[in-house]
Amino acid sequence: MKFKPLGERALVKLVEREEKTASGIVLPDTAKEKPQTAEVIAVGDSEDIKVKEGDVVVFAKYSGTEISLNGDDYMILDADDILGVVEE
């Protein structure tokens, strides 16, 4: 199944964080913070959205709508909730 966001929205896949601390302690799922970085999978049809497919973005902590497509978890973010693009 394909999904195309509408307007100024982006479909993103969360970038998972390391499950161990720097000192080697393994974190249980309940102790992990919700990730705030994601890879952009698809963007809406608005010319005002400033991200493109493949960008890694940082987004506001309590934003977005979680959805499941083909057994994978994604989020739909409004462009206003995207705080910036990670550049390497």
UniProtKB/Swiss-Prot annotation:
SUPFAM superfamilies: GroES-like (SSF50129). It comes from Rubrobacter xylanophilus (strain DSM 9941 / JCM 11954 / NBRC 16129 / PRD-1). This is Co-chaperonin GroES. Heptamer of 7 subunits arranged in a ring. Interacts with the chaperonin GroEL. Its main location: cytoplasm. CDD domains: cpn10. The keyword Thylakoid does not apply. Belongs to the GroES chaperonin family. Pfam families: Cpn10. Together with the chaperonin GroEL, plays an essential role in assisting protein folding. The GroEL-GroES system forms a nano-cage that allows encapsulation of the non-native substrate proteins and provides a physical environment optimized to promote and accelerate protein folding. GroES binds to the apical surface of the GroEL ring, thereby capping the opening of the GroEL channel. It is found in: Cytoplasm. One of its GO terms (biological process) is chaperone cofactor-dependent protein refolding. Keywords: Chaperone, Cytoplasm.
